Every structure is written in structure tokens, then in C-alpha cells.
Amino acid sequence: MIGNLNIANSNRKDTNIKFTKDQEIAVHELIEFLAQPWDDKKYINALCGAGGTGKTFVIKYVINNCKWSGGVIGCAAPTHKACRVLSNSIGGKEVNTIQSLFGFRLDVNIENFDPENPAFNPVGKDKLDGLKVLIIDEASMLNAKLVKYISNKCKKLQIKVIMLGDSSQLPPVNEKTSQAFLIASNTYYLKEVVRQGDNNPISKLLKLLREDIDNKNGWRFLDYISKNRQDYNE
């Protein structure tokens, strides 16, 4: 169990916030990651978890308490809706679409992006100047070629990257898994759902479903449903 967070920034805010064990580990390690000198082999970390485990709660704390000021921390997401949700969750900080941040023009289909085969010269002026940290939400939506492009671009500019998302969500089109989490040198998992009460039957159901997906076995989920039908009847 981690005690007080002893990190590079001694002027931490929100010192009375309580974290789950997984959240505390993620907060400590991500702030430490951002405090470390640049490393060409360790510049991408990831934070994974289902909805309600507190990914944006954790990342808001990291933004407010890491060594970098908000002006050099960029945030992005694949869709405008995801941008709005993330912005609202982290106190109104600006969040750009990946297309806008990296200078991809409107003719780019984000799901089938291929920088080696660009249609109509899609790469324009990016908005990465001065950034030291880039946080990307809904990273499971990014296909392998887009992840590679982002990785290479950020490596060239020495921008550290934190990928956020749910590794159990549907992968990008024609891919079995999202490379966004595989490319990370360290990945931190949030497993405890805190948005719903412990006695909520839906919470239990979702937990079993995720475990069956991870284990490639659907029997526990189905068995639980058959034995607890009354909990889900109207």
C-alpha cells in the first residue's frame, strides 16, 4: 500500500483527495513518469480501466500536480464528443481532436488513416509547438498506423504521451487489439468501479462480463444471469 505521494512537485494541490489502491499507484507512477528526464524508449505510458473506475479523475489530479504547467500539457481525443466529455471532466481545459492537433485535414478518415498512403496530402500544420505532455483519451479507437504516426511525431519532438482508455472496448476496424496500449512502456489498470454502488447488480454484471472477455470465456457471466434473473426483472 502506498502512503503519502512523495513526488517531484512539492506544492501539490488537492492533498485531501482519497484514491483507491489502483488509482493511487497510477497517480504516483504517472507523476513520476512526467518528472523523469526524457528517455527515447520510455516516453509513452497508458492508463486503462472500464467506465466508472476513475481514469479522468486520476488524470485531472496528474495534470494539476505534475511538474509541468497546464500550458505545456496538451489533451486530445478522436471525436468532438470525446473532447467535450474529457474537457468537462478535467475542469474545462481545452481538448483538441487528434485531427486538429496533428494537422490532419478534413478528408482524413480517422478509422482508416494511413500516413504512408495519404489521400489529398492530408497532413497540414500541427499544434504541437511547446508541448511537453500529450494526453490522449479514447485511445482504443486509434488504429496501428495512427498510433505509430503519433508515437514517431512525439518522439521527434520529445513529447511524453499518456494514453487513456478501455482495453476491453472494441478494437479499431480490421484489428484484433489497439496498439495504443501495447506500445506503452508502462500500463496502469484501474479495476475498482467507484461510480456505482457495491450493491448495484449492474456493477457485478459488468465486472463478470469484462472478466469473461479477458479470459475468453462467457460462462461465468451467463451462469450469474441464470441464477439472478430476479435482480434484472423490471
Question: Language-model segments: which ranges?
Answer:
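Conserved helicase motor core of P-loop NTPases
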Residues: 3-5, 11, 26-33, 38-45, ...
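The conserved Walker
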Residues: 51
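Conserved lysine of the Walker
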Residues: 55
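Loop/turn-to-beta-strand initiation segments
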Residues: 72, 130-133, 157-162
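Walker B catalytic acidic pair
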Residues: 137-138, 165-167
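Short, conserved "post-DEAD/DEAH" coupling segment immediately C-terminal to helicase motif II
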Residues: 144-159, 177-179
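Hydrophobic positions on the alpha1 helix immediately C-terminal to the Walker A/P-loop
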Residues: 58, 62
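Inter-Walker segment of RecA-like/P-loop motor cores
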Residues: 74-130
